[in-house]
Amino acid sequence: MSDLSKYRNIGIFAHVDAGKTTTTERILKLTGQIHKTGEVHDGESTTDFMEQEAERGITIQSAAVSCFWKDHRFNVIDTPGHVDFTVEVYRSLKVLDGGIGVFCGSGGVEPQSETNWRYANDSEVARIIFVNKLDRIGADFLNVVDQIKNVLGAVPLVMTLPIGREDDFVGVVDILSRQAYVWDDTGLPENYEITDIPADMVDDVEAYREELIETALEQDDDLLEAYMEGEMPTDEQVKMCIRRGTRDCSFFPTYCGSAFKNKGMQLILDAVVDYLPSPTEVDPQPLTDPETGEPTGEVATVSVDAPLKALAFKIMDDRFGALTFIRIYAGKLNKGDTILNSATGKTERIGRMVEMQADQRNELSSAQAGDIIAVVGMKNVKTGHTLCDVKHECTLEAMIFPTPVISIAVTPKDKGGSEKMGIAIGKMVAEDPSFLVHTDEETGETILKGMGELHLDIKVDILKRTYGVDLIVGAPQVAYRETITKPVEDSYTHKKQSGGSGQFGKIDYIMKPGEVGSGFKFTSSVVGGNVPKEFWPAIEKGFKGMMDTGVLAGFPVLDVEIELLDGGFHAVDSSAVAFEIAAKGAFRQSMPKAGAQLLEPIMAVDVFTPEDHVGDVIGDLNRRRGMIKDQMAGVTGSRIKADVPLSEMFGYIGHLRTMTSGRGQFSMEFAHYAPCPVNVAATVIEEVKALNAKK
């Protein structure tokens, strides 16, 4: 039985190209899990094992690896940095207890680092900070520390200082122990010596040490009071306070180094052991009502002796077969056990269990609370499903994923590809909850929906190369929505007579705008028996069913409230079907009267540009109907934040690179829906009508 206090379930988060995957490679090298470190730029990293990852030099999936350091077990997840794959970051945060935020020593706090940091804050995940790439030209550790304070609003607790800058970066000073770690030029992580602090750094180290101790001791009033009276705490007492403050996110221990040059990595591994929480030191996962999704007040207390409670957080189909990644919160899981999937009510028998080393597998006979493992061949499990003891059914808090904002139509080039594509897409949808698919019934086209251009580009590439489906790909389409802007009181009668019993249903109602994000809401204030209560659910069903297809251009409808006021029925001809049809007709009749309006998705765009191109970038965003929200000057350039309609952002990366001579970067994520300008709405509606006319 493993000691849970020696478990560390951690994620590595950062902006694209800040060095997350290289950091993971160095961790695996130092912990003895790999003997030759693979490099991202060579396409050989252990955690980037998809073809598309190796080629593009980015992480697309979150890959789980296990390793050991100083008798502690690390389960490490290397997550994507590109905003189109943020869902991977989100679901990783759901099952982690701590994290390492990696920042580039020259790039500082970049757009996606800010997004990931916000997600980690929302999940209350304890973190340490690693400022990487200090061997690069322009790297400035203390400048990045200032950005972390000013941009993220975080409190970085500086634990190490760099010795030398850029090409002359040779090592780090451990501030608490007052020791210098200096590496030689071989690039080997073990080739270092511990020496005295360089003479020209002594004063700085003492100043930072005093600040470190004062900040840490704020976690313990007695130690702080003694310190103020002149009594120095021991290093162990300071570490205890740092651990406490890190666990509750009061501050974030901050380290510097170069993962690529193997400098400073041992101190980061020590920090994971010393300061990040074990599974028993984080708030337990809440249990929810399976019907309503509301918390029950009970929690999944982390204990090996409790009944099984586990969460399936990722499905992956690789060359070995279907894998279900699960985090075990309570209990034990043995090969051959029969467990319950509380989402489906069906049981599953555990066949093979494996511990992952990226795309390598180690067979397991058992696992316990605190473990992150993969189970081979589960049939009916999806991301977010709870797996539990058959005699102790429970449901863990659900995983909520963002709604796709962009779509493309794809068709196989030959008829034989249809079945192959269907099988492939089924697997891909199971793997990625932010990737949705449906078939256009009129055209027969398959519509792929995703989080951005790169997201869908990768999916098409996987279909073509991994599954061998040759495709015709249409232009990207925006996920518009419709809504109403004013209340309308109306009446509708459905009457049909065709011999024998007919159909009759009359409803009087108010259709009015709902609160933003409220979706559909139905209430009834009918008094008396003019519309018997037994027909109310059918009326609600009819209205709600029409929310999928608006009257302007057939887009889904947002935020509508219906209040049923009165109506009429016929003793023979009225039925649930008649009233459902009446509600559908009422929706079509009243939505135009209620000021139907087209909505477009607005993206929160974060652009980095060299200073001499700021004017061009802002002017271009304005031409794209963007609203500038913020502009921040940095050492290497400026960051511009703007809200821009998605329809104006297709192909933006190429245009930005042209404007900035290849030096500009940007990220964007869905912000909200907003009314389309009249001229834009008219164009969109005409385009939809023209497209429908061709069908």
UniProtKB/Swiss-Prot annotation:
SMART domains attached to this UniProt entry: EFG_C, EFG_IV
Subcellular location: Cytoplasm
Cited Gene3D superfamilies: 3.30.230.10, 3.30.70.240, Elongation Factor G (Translational Gtpase), domain 3, P-loop containing nucleotide triphosphate hydrolases, Translation factors
GO cellular component, one term: cytoplasm
Domain tr-type G: 5-280
Matches recorded under NCBIfam families: EF-G, PRK12740.1-5, small_GTP
Name of the protein: Elongation factor G 2
Organism placement in taxonomy: Bacteria, Pseudomonadati, Pseudomonadota, Gammaproteobacteria, Vibrionales
